[in-house]
Amino acid sequence: MSELRAFSAPGKALLAGGYLVLDTKYEAFVVGLSARMHAVAHPYGSLQGSDKFEVRVKSKQFKDGEWLYHISPKSGFIPVSIGGSKNPFIEKVIANVFSYFKPNMDDYCNRNLFVIDIFSDDAYHSQEDSVTEHRGNRRLSFHSHRIEEVPKTGLGSSAGLVTVLTTALASFFVSDLENNVDKYREVIHNLAQVAHCQAQGKIGSGFDVAAAAYGSIRYRRFPPALISNLPDIGSATYGSKLAHLVDEEDWNITIKSNHLPSGLTLWMGDIKNGSETVKLVQKVKNWYDSHMPESLKIYTELDHANSRFMDGLSKLDRLHETHDDYSDQIFESLERNDCTCQKYPEITEVRDAVATIRRSFRKITKESGADIEPPVQTSLLDDCQTLKGVLTCLIPGAGGYDAIAVITKQDVDLRAQTANDKRFSKVQWLDVTQADWGVRKEKDPETYLDK
């Protein structure tokens, strides 16, 4: 490509389907977030006399943020790190994109250097020890530490990185990708799922990558064997098996566009504590296996409550679009958040569904020892529910101590409501909203770069 080009992918919040999303039987609701990961692909460069490709991925927002890899068709497109700095997510993206497209060295002898700059919006990382710069209409933070040393907020930075880097790297091989992201969205998604699972060393549910590719969605996962059955990267059959998986295999996956109702918005609260998701998941799995059939009954109740929650949001969305007197009364009642809310089933259905979800997670917390909704979070959520304009609130994702999600009327300002209130002293409201769109092309790519 002879032109500079930029792409971005959203973060995520899993609002319904925590733990159940790991099972192919259950659907989940994933909201894409306005916090985005960005990739700027530079025009082709040339390494004269080289029989290898070189990929340079740079992240100027972090100390020592540069990763160099050589890739050769002769060695099965296995990336070889140059200079010692490695990143498993970048490495697996490179391996899979090259293995899928199988570029011929003769066709790229004068354009075998690929340079990509990565940027992340503020909300993904702690802002301590950072300097903020404005690049175009974007606010970017530049950190004094290495990327692995900067605390993350749990919005899906690795899935966003893998998805947007897959898109940017693929644009070197697909001339019309920049202006036709929709055309290649499924290929991008499938390649990113493979790379992300390999980089993590496990076959996750994939909801975070799906949200990065598609935005806000209703999601049911793919069978793990699709990816675990792939041969080793670099093997003689890897490229053909990967291409078959990406292009021809039935993934048996559900990805349906879905979104929060018009007139409502999402607030994400970052709590100054952390949870180890892997340990939580393992504790819940151990509990589930040892408490059958009671655990299956709880999961079934959770699934039904998740469906009622999603269906209730859809009803509110349709209602808001009517703009009639009844709709106005409901949203006025919600703004006051007083006893009049009990008159409207459109409000109580959502709240009752979330109450069931939270009650089930508290039961699992008590029986498994996994702090999905520990008492301190229960108190915080109950306090949030009393705020003006709040429809409902819950623990997103796998739960724990590190985040809350609150759905409110569109024009509500939770920062103003909770300022100087000791009950919310540990909550930092993140500068994010819902984003219905997934990976996409960005305008004015030159505005990302130093002048």
Swiss-Prot record:
Q: Which Gene3D superfamilies does the UniProt record give?
A: 3.30.230.10
GO-annotated cellular components? cytoplasm; nucleus; peroxisome; vacuole
Enzyme class label: transferase
| Record-annotated disulphide pairs | none
Catalytic reaction list:
(R)-5-phosphomevalonate + ATP = (R)-5-diphosphomevalonate + ADP
**Cross-referenced Pfam families:** GHMP_kinases_N
Q: Which GO terms describe its molecular function?
A: ATP binding; phosphomevalonate kinase activity
Q: Which domain of life is it from?
A: Eukaryota
**Carries keyword S-adenosyl-L-methionine?**
no
Q: What function is annotated for this protein?
A: Phosphomevalonate kinase; part of the second module of ergosterol biosynthesis pathway that includes the middle steps of the pathway. ERG8 converts 5-phosphomevalonate to 5-diphosphomevalonate. The second module is carried out in the vacuole and involves the formation of farnesyl diphosphate, which is also an important intermediate in the biosynthesis of ubiquinone, dolichol, heme and prenylated proteins. Activity by the mevalonate kinase ERG12 first converts mevalonate into 5-phosphomevalonate.
* Extra information: Present with 79 molecules/cell in log phase SD medium.
In Swiss-Prot or TrEMBL terms, this protein is called: Phosphomevalonate kinase
